[in-house]
Amino acid sequence: MIQAIVTDIEGTTTDIRFVQQVLFPYARERLTPFLREHQQDEEVANALLSLRREVEQPDADIETLITTLHSFMDEDRKSTALKAIQGIIWRSGYLQGDFRGHLYPDVTPQLADWQQQGLKLYVYSSGSVDAQKLLFGYSDAGDLQPLFSGYFDTHVGAKREVSAYQNIAHQLAIAPQALLFLSDIRQELDAAQLAGWQTCQLIRDLPDSESRHLQVSRFDEIDIEGFTA
């Protein structure tokens, strides 16, 4: 019996185009001047320290780090430091009303229904926990943060690594077979399944012919009772 649902964001709750055409360009355009101005701010300084450790360049100056971050964005690297800095920049965008977090219309009602049924809801995304909270806190459906019991990012591991799902299950103290992971990416679901989780693939466009996971096109097509250990 499912006790908790963990959902991905990009391509699952949220149109991938919002991330790629709104969020990513917004951060890219502002990254250089933002870091030059705010490099001494505590949360920015901590992210830059993490970046120096990640690239094993403890003495790298700000211009070197800026170049590195732009390279990471070009590569779409799932860098924890990059995600933290993007999240800090996006915060100002949400607060200023430059954009609101996109959610597919089927998402909010179903999340609310699951919560009312007593299911715990969590988010696991490559984006930083702060960025996740911003997207759901300033979504086009309002502030949805009260629906969620917690958030996970790459601090628990990469989304295609089995150990990440083992870590989440351990932190939640819930048996893996009682956890359901929702994602649009087959390889992420493969990793969750190998960790003993239940899985469901959200297909917002064309079906994934290579996937062995249950596929649905909307959140309200997910039958929680259909998942058994």
Swiss-Prot record:
It is an enzyme of class 3 (hydrolase). Its EC number is 3.1.3.77. InterPro entries: Enolase-ppase_E1, HAD-like_sf, HAD-SF_hydro_IA, HAD_sf. Binds 1 Mg(2+) ion per subunit. CDD domains: HAD_EP (cd01629). One of its GO terms (biological process) is L-methionine salvage from methylthioadenosine. Gene3D superfamilies: 1.10.720.60, HAD superfamily/HAD-like (3.40.50.1000). Pathway: Amino-acid biosynthesis; L-methionine biosynthesis via salvage pathway; L-methionine from S-methyl-5-thio-alpha-D-ribose 1-phosphate: step 3/6; Amino-acid biosynthesis; L-methionine biosynthesis via salvage pathway; L-methionine from S-methyl-5-thio-alpha-D-ribose 1-phosphate: step 4/6. The keyword Magnesium applies. It comes from the Bacteria. Pfam families: Hydrolase (PF00702). GO terms for molecular function: 2,3-diketo-5-methylthiopentyl-1-phosphate enolase activity; 2-hydroxy-3-keto-5-methylthiopentenyl-1-phosphate phosphatase activity; acireductone synthase activity; magnesium ion binding. Its cofactor is Mg(2+). Keywords: Amino-acid biosynthesis, Hydrolase, Magnesium, Metal-binding, Methionine biosynthesis. It catalyses: 5-methylsulfanyl-2,3-dioxopentyl phosphate + H2O = 1,2-dihydroxy-5-(methylsulfanyl)pent-1-en-3-one + phosphate. Monomer. HAMAP family: Salvage_MtnC. Bifunctional enzyme that catalyzes the enolization of 2,3-diketo-5-methylthiopentyl-1-phosphate (DK-MTP-1-P) into the intermediate 2-hydroxy-3-keto-5-methylthiopentenyl-1-phosphate (HK-MTPenyl-1-P), which is then dephosphorylated to form the acireductone 1,2-dihydroxy-3-keto-5-methylthiopentene (DHK-MTPene). Belongs to the HAD-like hydrolase superfamily. MasA/MtnC family. This is Enolase-phosphatase E1. It comes from Yersinia enterocolitica serotype O:8 / biotype 1B (strain NCTC 13174 / 8081). The lineage of its organism: Bacteria, Pseudomonadati, Pseudomonadota, Gammaproteobacteria, Enterobacterales.
